[in-house]
Amino acid sequence: MNIELLQQLCEASAVSGDEQEVRDILINTLEPCVNEITFDGLGSFVARKGNKGPKVAVVGHMDEVGFMVTHIDESGFLRFTTIGGWWNQSMLNHRVTIRTHKGFKIPGVIGSVAPHALTEKQKQQPLSFDEMFIDIGANSRDEVEKRGVAMGDFISPEANFACWGEDKVVGKALDNRIGCAMMAELLQTVNNPEITLYGVGSVEEEVGLRGAQTSAEHIKPDVVIVLDTAVAGDVPGIDNIKYPLKPGQGPGLMLFDKRYFPNQKLVAAFKNCATQNDLPLQFSTMKTGATDGGRYNVMGGGRPVVALCLPTRYLHANSGMISKADYDALLTLIRGFLTTLTAEKVNAFSQFRQVD
């Protein structure tokens, strides 16, 4: 794990629709080691390494869930809307960062009412999104505007990256900066002249997998590996039958989500690669969410796709948590798969005639 790169990516502000900070980091990281960097029309980052053989894409979405300023009242408080999926009980009194239209960072906090001022009934009722506000310490609308904050500015949770103990990494936007970091590490270290390797940082995954569709059309890949996070079911309050993944017990292979089924030959290939290299591999399903695989697998008549994920505690909140060991195992697994890939193997993934 390149912990410095992951920290840099996690501390960037890059809410869906405003991914520039992560895009810049990926450009600076990968420009020295790839043949070409291009972008699709929505802004997805596409790095190409090699120029012959089948096109193999490794995809990690750049965007994170966050908010947008929708109103500034006369007292200087900001109203906002959510971008991506949030649970209102995970938001109150958390610090946030407003990225102004000029790129400046303004700190704020999602305000909460002191318990002394709440009735017993109010204490039992969660606050709706529409009732929430952000306080940046301003005393008026004019003061807010002088700081450069305006309607339409994007808001992300405050950066809080840390390593806890020997194995855990904590921070905002691990969904899906771990995918971006791993994609970059693979582009830096995999050298296989049999394939053309693409690293993709897609945009707007959290609001509808939009960059997956546009980047798929841009590249037209032959095989796609999607990197993402998945719910860890090892904490109190989560059904560990529906969510069986546990941090520290290996990465996960997504068997299906709301928009995707993996190519079964790809699944078998990764199972075999994990066994041969003595790497742990868990399995997961997701009925209520989707990954970029849901767009890549239906583009251009259909493509072989597999989604691989890291078990993550506290997704779509201010602080997620992953295992370093899981990250390293997944990196080793995919590197081993890509290093031994040939045109013949890639072609076989799309052969569906039963052979006697």
Give each language-model segment a name.
Residues M1-D356:
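N-terminal hydrophobic/helix-forming segments and targeting peptides
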